[in-house]
Amino acid sequence: MKTASFILSFVVLLIVIITWIGEVSAVSEPEPVAKATAHAAAVHVPPICSHRECRK
């Protein structure tokens, strides 16, 4: 019974580590991609606001 609980806790820990590494790499990697998509969205999407400053 001890080995089963040890294996279960090890698997849970492994899943947590994998998801944490995935989140960290997702945060650190696509910065230029996010900037490019934000720029493309700012260029192509018409502004919702009707202020003159927002329309420029």
Swiss-Prot record:
Residues 27-42 form a propeptide. Probably contains 1 disulfide bond, which may be crucial for activity, since the linear peptide without disulfide bond is inactive. This is Venom peptide 5. Residues 1-26 form the signal peptide. It comes from Eumenes pomiformis (Potter wasp). Keywords: Disulfide bond, Secreted, Signal. It is found in: Secreted. It comes from the Eukaryota. Expressed by the venom gland. One of its GO terms (cellular component) is extracellular region. Not found in venom, suggesting that it is a minor component. Negative results: The synthetic peptide (tested without disulfide bond) does not show activity against fungi (B.cinerea and C.albicans) and bacteria (E.coli and S.aureus). Has no hemolytic activity against human erythrocytes. Does not show cytolytic activity against insect cell lines. Does not induce feeding disorder in lepidopteran larvae after peptide injection in the vicinity of the head and thorax. Its main location: secreted. Disulfide bonds join C49-C54.
